[in-house]
From Swiss-Prot:
An example Gene Ontology biological process: proton motive force-driven plasma membrane ATP synthesis
Species per Swiss-Prot/TrEMBL record: Bacillus licheniformis (strain ATCC 14580 / DSM 13 / JCM 2505 / CCUG 7422 / NBRC 12200 / NCIMB 9375 / NCTC 10341 / NRRL NRS-1264 / Gibson 46)
GO MF, one example: ATP binding
Origin superkingdom: Bacteria
SUBUNIT field: F-type ATPases have 2 components, CF(1) - the catalytic core - and CF(0) - the membrane proton channel. CF(1) has five subunits: alpha(3), beta(3), gamma(1), delta(1), epsilon(1). CF(0) has three main subunits: a, b and c.
Gene Ontology cellular-component annotations: plasma membrane; proton-transporting ATP synthase complex
Record protein name field: ATP synthase gamma chain
Record function comment: Produces ATP from ADP in the presence of a proton gradient across the membrane. The gamma chain is believed to be important in regulating ATPase activity and the flow of protons through the CF(0) complex.
Length: 284
C-alpha cells in the first residue's frame, strides 16, 4: 500500500496536470471559434469559383491537362496533419486512411509520392520509408493563403508537368466541435466538376480557354487552401475535446486518490490509537 506521502504527491501532480489541460482546452476553444469562422467564410468564395469553372467546363471542347484523364503511372497524395499531437485521434485517423490507401493501390514506391502538410504526417511517412517529394510544416493557426501559396502552386504544377498523373487529398473535415470526418478527395484531374443546375449566364473575355488557363490552377489551389482551413478547425476541435477528456480523467483520478488518502490516514490513526491503548494496557 502506498504511503500517505506518495498519495499526497500523486494528488498534487494530477491537480497540476488538470490545470494545464484545462488551460489548453480553453485556448483550443478560442482558436476553434476563429478557425471555424474562417473556414465557413471561405465556402461562398469556393462555391462561386466552382460555379464559374463548371459553367465554362460544360461547354468547353478543348483538352486542358487539368481536366483530362491520362494513363496513371504515378499517384500523388497530399496529406494534411498537424504539427503537434495532444489532439486525440486527429492525426492517427487521417494517416491510417492515407497509409491504407497507399498499401492497397501500389506495389512499388515508384508508383506514388506524398506531399506532407504538417510535421506529424511528414515524420510518419519518412519513418516508414514512403517517398515525400514536398513538405510544409510550421503553419500558423491563423493561416493565410499567402503562406501556403507556394506549396499549392508547386503541387498543381507537378501535376501539369506530369510528375504524377492524379492527386488525392486527405484531411479531417470539420463537422462540429465534437465530430470530425476523415475525408479522401480526388483533387486532380478536375473531372468531377458538376455544372450548376440553374445555369448562370456569363460573358467571357478574352475567351474561355485563356480564362481556364488562369482559373483552373487557382481553383485547384483554392481547394487545397479550403481543405487546410477545414483541417485547422478540426484540429482545434479535436484538441479541445482531448484536453477536456484529460481534465475529466484527472479529476476522477484525484477523487480516487483522495479517497485512498483518507482511508490510509484513517488506518494510520487507528493503528496509532491501537498502539497507544496497547502500550497503556501493558503498563498497568
Amino acid at each position: 500500500m502506498a504511503s500517505l506521502r506518495d498519495i499526497k504527491s500523486r494528488i498534487a501532480s494530477n491537480k497540476k496536470m488538470s490545470q494545464i489541460t484545462k488551460a489548453q482546452e480553453m485556448v483550443s476553444a478560442s482558436k476553434l471559434n476563429r478557425a471555424e469562422n474562417k473556414a465557413k467564410s471561405f465556402v461562398p468564395y469556393m462555391e462561386k469559383m466552382q460555379e464559374v469553372v463548371a459553367d465554362i467546363a460544360v461547354g468547353y471542347t478543348g483538352k486542358h491537362p487539368m481536366m483530362s484523364s491520362r494513363p496513371v503511372k504515378r499517384t500523388g497524395y497530399l496529406v494534411i496533419t498537424a504539427d503537434r499531437g495532444l489532439a486525440g485521434a486527429f492525426n492517427a485517423n487521417v494517416l491510417r486512411k492515407a497509409y491504407q490507401r497507399i498499401q492497397e493501390r501500389h506495389q512499388s514506391k515508384d508508383e506514388y509520392a506524398v506531399i506532407a502538410v504538417g510535421r506529424m504526417g511528414r515524420d510518419f511517412f519518412k519513418k516508414r520509408g514512403i517517398p515525400v517529394i514536398s513538405e510544409m510544416t510550421g503553419i500558423r493557426d491563423e493561416v493565410t493563403f499567402s503562406e501556403i501559396k507556394d506549396l499549392a502552386n508547386s503541387t498543381v504544377q507537378m501535376y501539369i508537368d506530369e510528375t504524377f498523373d492524379e492527386l488525392y487529398l486527405f484531411y479531417n473535415h470539420f463537422v462540429s466541435a465534437i465530430s470530425q470526418e476523415v475525408t479522401e478527395k480526388k483533387l486532380l484531374p478536375l473531372t468531377d466538376i458538376a455544372p450548376n443546375k440553374k445555369k448562370t449566364s456569363f460573358e467571357f473575355e478574352p475567351d474561355e480557354e485563356e480564362i481556364l488557363e488562369v482559373l483552373l490552377p487557382q481553383y485547384a489551389e483554392s481547394l487545397i487552401f479550403g481543405a487546410l482551413l477545414d483541417s485547422k478547425a478540426s484540429e482545434h476541435a479535436a484538441r479541445m475535446t482531448a484536453m477536456r477528456n484529460a481534465t475529466d480523467n484527472a479529476k476522477e483520478i484525484i477523487a480516487d486518490l483522495e479517497l485512498s488518502y483518507n482511508r490510509a490516514r484513517q488506518a494510520s490513526i487507528t493503528q496509532e490509537i491501537t498502539e497507544i491503548v496497547g502500550g497503556a494496557a501493558a503498563l498497568e
